Amino acid sequence: DEKISRQIGGQADTSPNFPKAKWDKFTPKLGLRYQYTEDMMVFGTLSRGFRSGGFNGRVGGGLEEATQPYDPETVDNVEFGIKSEWLDNRVRLNASAFLMKFDEKQEELKLPNSGGATGQKTVVVNAAEATITGLEVELQAQVSDALYVRANVGLLDAEYDSFKYTGSDGNAVDLSDRDFRRAPDVTMNIDATYSWDLGGGEAWVRGSVRYLGKHFIDNENTTELANGAQTIVDMSVNYRVDALTFSLFGRNLTDEDGYT
């Protein structure tokens, strides 16, 4: 049948340029916990993460560039910390420290199109070796039946040990020792919720203050595009009765501006 033969023939793809690749990786994980007391536990974790390689698909460099795969990314992670409860479980204090080592880190870059094409292309390259170290502390407290408070602090050092690639113009680009984009050295947050009974339902007010240290928004760490320290305040007023909930929100009440 001619119609059937057309359908079958139309589904065949004999293109010699159809790219194929396969990646696999052993990703072990080891975790240890020790219950020091009934209310305190310490833990440690060793693990390896894996992100598969792939293809960039359509890019401005043409078919040859689009069919060249980028390699997988691996990260080795070490973390240890403590989890604890105090004052009859009304206060919870947790802390952890971690170290992450990236190998063949995949980076998404926006580059000028090559081969005479106009505009930009977005490509993924294995450009970087990187290290992240950090410390996180979290406190939760049921101060009273009506008041709940939560706070956390994060310290982060996220830096590229080696970040080199070839630009579309053929020149070498070296971003080694630059900071990760959108990775403030210091972050802090505190939020509180106060609730009470009202008119057969429940009312509550929630407010939060969030602090972000100075950070860059691009891989090049362009000073003119850096965000300075930011303090962002949010608040909401809420009322729930039966199956209905009414809320009034206020976002970024300090009117902080920044690059995204």
Where are these regions (language model features)?
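Membrane-embedded beta-barrel scaffold of Gram-negative outer-membrane proteins
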Residues: 35, 42-43, 69-135, 142, ...
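Transmembrane beta-strands of outer-membrane beta-barrel proteins
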Residues: 2, 28, 42, 91-95, ...
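Residues on the lipid-exposed face of transmembrane beta-strands in outer-membrane beta-barrel proteins
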Residues: 22, 30-34, 80-84, 137-141, ...
